[in-house]
Structure formats: C-alpha cells, structure tokens
A protein has these predicted regions:
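Transmembrane beta-barrel architecture of outer-membrane proteins
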Residues: 108-116, 159-163, 219-225, 268-272, ...
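Residue-level detector of the transmembrane beta-barrel scaffold of outer-membrane proteins
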Residues: 83, 87-89, 127-135, 177-181, ...
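N-terminal signal peptide c-region/cleavage motif recognized by signal peptidases
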Residues: 47-49
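Short glycine/proline- and aromatic-enriched beta-strand/turn motifs that initiate or cap beta-hairpins
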Residues: 53-150
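Outer-membrane beta-barrel strand-turn architecture
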Residues: 121-126, 170-178, 232-236, 279-284, ...
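Outer-membrane beta-barrel architecture
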Residues: 114-121, 165-167, 225-229, 270-276, ...
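Outer membrane beta-barrel transmembrane domains
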Residues: 253-356
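Outer-membrane pore/translocation modules
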Residues: 60-68, 122-268, 298-300, 304-310
Length: 356
C-alpha cells in the first residue's frame, strides 16, 4: 500500500503528480502517445527516497492510477474522427503524414489509405442527381517515446473503416454545384505496444496495458457535410474548385473497459483546387492533360490537434486521361503525387482520381 507520505503528496505518488502537472500541454506533443509520455516521466518522479521503501506492485498501481486520471480517450476518438474526414474526398489516395514531436518523443507517422467508389444516379447534369459513396479506409499511427537510456516504448494504432454516404449533386448554375451529404460508418481500432528496457518491461507494461496501450475497440461514426463544386475554363485551363465543411461524431461501441470508452466530435474545412491543361499528347490512345493540385485542410474543435496537427496544405502535379470516347461510365482518370506540409506536419501522398 502507498503510505501516508504519498497520500500527502510528499512520497513517490506526490512526485508523480507534480511532474504530471508540469508537463507542457503543447500541440507539438503527439496526442496519441502523450499519455505514455506522462507515464514515463511519472516514473522518473518515482526515483526518490521513497522508492526504496515502496513495493513494485504499489508502484505499478500508482502509475496505473495516475495514467487513468490523465488518460483521455476522447483524443483517440477525435483523432479517428479527423481521419474519417480524410475519406470525404472522392479520390483513391495514399498519404503519409509525419507530425512534429517534442524532445524525447520519436516523430510519429500516420499512414492513410482510402478506396472510394461513387455512384451517381441519372445522366442529366443540369438537374439534381442523387449519389452514393462507399469508402474503405485503413490507417496506421506509429509513435514512440525514448525517455531514458536503454528505455523505449513503441506504439502502433491500426484502424480499418467502412463508410457509406449519400447526397445530392444540385446544380446552381452552369459552373457551380451544391453538395449536401450524410454518412455513417464503422471502424475497428487496435493498439499494440512494444516495451524495451527494465523499467518499461517491469513497471510500465503492466501499468499501461489495457489502458493506454494494448487494447482494441470498435466505433461507429456519423457525419454530415456541405460542399460545393465549381468548374470552368480560364485562360486555356480547366479549373476545378471543390470545398466542404464537415462534422463527424464518433462513439466506441465495445470498449474493453469504461476508462477507454469515448465519444468525440470533429469538424473540418477542406479546399481542393485543380488546374487541368490539355496537351497535344496521348497516353494509351487517350488525350493527356497536365494537372496542378493544391489543397488545404483545417480541423476545428477542442481536440483539433488530436493527431498532432490541426491544418496542412497539399501541392502536387499529375496527369489526366480523357477516357470519355471509350464509352465507359468514367469521363477521366487522374494520377498524381503531392507534397504535404504545415506548421506541425509534413509528408507526401499518391492520388488516383476519377470523374464521372
């Protein structure tokens, strides 16, 4: 048992609490491993005269209790909701994000892949047309913390998700369409951690397993978005401007315990600008155009930095193949590469797009 000194805040547990309260809560801490950072620093607080008289089980219980007090699964839910927002785009894409991290925190990486299929009902583009979009998405978040010589914790989150959304493509003019959309989705979230070093293996692993690390759950998401699609020809370029404001709610449905149960909300604004310049060339017998890509995403809400960043830009280039003469349902296919950059993140991605 923890003695009276600890209860008064002068023993090991008091040292833990003091250090927990002094950790800077900046956006540059990766939110998904921040609790591990806190727990690791908390153990440093245990290196006090009270350590000699404390039992290992008591230390594990103390770390677990304080991690439970500071662990906020809402951040995990908010991070998942933010990743769901990435799937709003109709493009097949693979992106790699590398958020910045603080000293001692290994720079995390977020890998996102999505495969959407969109079905538009009706051929009259001058009239409102309903559409359905199904998306299969996969994400991994890898991170870690090197908090002492010979000590390391590596964490990996893996999520699989499926969403189905429906909406209307409502023409407002020759160039502008309005896109209201509602959606629902299901996802699985799984975490696995690797511990290296005696402190990590003997104290932090039993203290944090099933709470901060090494647990899985499922979640349902509900979302709505209002978007626009503006297209016209300017100075020999076909210009497309797509924008949307979206809001997603995510809720765990079979959390292993009450401490990792979450309900989170996330809002985002996405802007995507594409310029298409026809060329005299052909690829595989299809007219070829050069495409310029520019985009911006901003995440809003109290947990907007759950992924370690709340905004980023995209810039890239690609090619567009006009396949309309083949009689397919598709009008064009697009392939490109993009750079991702922002105040707290950088990365890159690949795009395979299509236009119906």
């Amino acid at each position: 048992m923890i003695g009276p000194a600890a209860q008064r805040g002068t023993g090991p547990r008091g040292g833990i609490r003091t250090l927990l309260q002094s950790v800077p809560k900046t956006r540059r801490y990766n939110s998904l491993i921040r609790e591990a950072v806190l727990a690791a620093i908390a153990f440093i607080g245990l290196c006090s005269p009270g350590l000699a008289s404390a039992q290992s089980d008591d230390l594990i219980d103390a770390i677990r209790e304080l991690a439970r007090e500071n662990f906020d699964p809402v951040k995990i839910g908010a991070g998942y909701a933010a990743m769901v927002d990435f799937a709003v785009s109709p493009d097949i894409s693979s992106a790699n994000f590398y958020p910045d991290a603080s000293d001692g925190v290994v720079d995390p990486s977020l890998k996102h892949f999505q495969f959407p299929l969109r079905f538009v009902f009706g051929d009259d583009e001058s009239a409102p047309r309903p559409f359905l979009q199904a998306v299969v998405a996969h994400q991994t978040v890898e991170s870690g913390f090197d908090y002492a010589p010979g000590e390391f914790i590596a964490s990996e989150w893996e999520t699989w998700g499926f969403s189905l959304s429906g909406g209307y493509d409502v023409p407002l003019s020759e160039h502008l369409s309005f896109l209201p959309v509602l959606g629902v989705g299901y996802g699985s979230l799984d975490n696995r951690a690797r511990y290296s070093g005696p402190i990590s293996e003997q104290l932090l692993q039993p203290a944090l397993a099933g709470l901060v690390f090494d647990w899985d759950t499922s979640a349902v998401t509900y979302g709505a978005s209002l978007g626009f699609d503006y297209r016209r020809t300017l100075a020999g370029f076909d210009v497309e401007v797509l924008g949307s404001v979206s809001h997603h709610y995510v809720e765990s449905i079979d959390a292993p315990n009450e401490f990792v149960d979450f309900r989170s909300r996330m809002s985002a604004f996405d802007l995507d600008v594409r310029t298409i310049h026809p060329t005299p060339w052909k690829m595989f017998g299809n007219p070829l155009s050069i495409v310029g890509l520019f985009g911006n995403t901003r995440i809003f809400g109290p947990e907007r930095d759950a992924l370690g960043f709340d905004s980023f830009f995209e810039a890239g280039a690609g090619v567009d193949l006009d396949v309309s003469a083949r009689g397919w349902k598709l009008k064009s296919l697009r392939f490109g590469v993009k750079a991702i950059f922002g105040p707290d993140v950088d990365g890159w991605g690949l795009i395979i797009g299509y236009r119906l």
